[in-house]
């Protein structure tokens, strides 16, 4: 039975989702969780895009131990050398070089002839192979490329040293039958086919990204590319968790097994959702809140009698726990540390002490602490520690009618304290006005969302905000049991990002 490898591009293609703006620390958090998920290759970013991207890719490359770290690059020498500088410190570095091969791209975007494109592929892959142990070549817009020319381009890439060949459905145009036949065509038409691993990369514009990916596996693809939760530009990418579970459940049909630690799927999905601010739909396959819920009386009766009557996936397979309480206010530092290690978290003594203190404060107010609470707590404290400014005091009081007054005290990384007060039509507006006054910002609140992390009146709140100034938009989140505190944390998180961006472009 063949093993299917997964290439995750959440940190590159996924971050291109409108409104998603991850900082370096957040990208590193996701990368570490992808490593726990057992992802074979992670595309850490596009090193040549900006200095910020370069530094993020480099830090991930120098941190990850059990996965290949890859940077995207155009078929340009400067891009390829920049990618090398970013990932050369990785345990297993890889270059991902791409060039469009469809007539429409060659004519209108590249302004290149077929001969020019083939020459560029040869030169870029040859250079990449002189620097990297493995090189992946992507024929951008492959599904709208003339098949004979695509086969020619792929052959040139393999002969130049490409180890992996990606056949992307860049605009989500193809369907499963066409995609399957395309892989079969290449298998028959590319002389050096056996010398490379073939990969698929599907977009969801017509809602067929997962189906197309599975068809590619049938057609001979040994690597599947996509993102967690299917996030990405436009309608998104193939959701890797859906492809992986489909292969596992239907291995009888596909004769393939996913090389992924499936029990880490739920935790990975939740982390990506909270850091990006992209809410997972309740009815989403595998990771949606209703994925294992049964409303119909007939279905409920069947499940109670024999679970397989209506449930083809065991919730535990993907790490969907029953969320039973695991710790309480009497739990000690050792029990807390061991539980966090079990969940995959590692920290320095200083980080452990800070998170344990936050845990004890929560345990004093919340009777039962669940695994979901612990993950949220860790996420919130990590963001809190990485911020330029942290909230040290927050006070809100009623003025008149619907007017509220908020006093906010912030401390920066150097220990400087800033205090101001402001009024607003409600507590949230007053808090946000006060923070704006302290930071000297004039921005628009583009989005505000609040979610309950667990059930019950004492549940933690997760607040997501998006701030916009001109054409630049950033997001932030905050986690706390108190809604106002979570809201303030989220705003400070986003405002700090925005202030950094403004200072950078000045």
Swiss-Prot record:
Family in the record: Belongs to the alpha-IPM synthase/homocitrate synthase family. LeuA type 1 subfamily.
Pyruvate carboxyltransferase domain: residues covered: 4-266
The protein's name: 2-isopropylmalate synthase
One GO term of the biological process aspect: L-leucine biosynthetic process
One of the record's GO cellular component terms: cytoplasm
Entries under PANTHER family matching the protein: 2-ISOPROPYLMALATE SYNTHASE 1, CHLOROPLASTIC-RELATED, HOMOCITRATE SYNTHASE-RELATED
UniProt lineage: Bacteria, Bacillati, Bacillota, Bacilli, Bacillales
Oligomeric and partner information: Homodimer.
GO molecular function: 2-isopropylmalate synthase activity; acetyl-CoA C-acetyltransferase activity; manganese ion binding
Catalytic reactions on record: 3-methyl-2-oxobutanoate + acetyl-CoA + H2O = (2S)-2-isopropylmalate + CoA + H(+)
Listed Pfam families: HCS_D2, HMGL-like, LeuA_dimer
Annotated positions binding Mn(2+): 13, 201, 203, 237
CDD domains: DRE_TIM_IPMS
Name of encoding gene: leuA
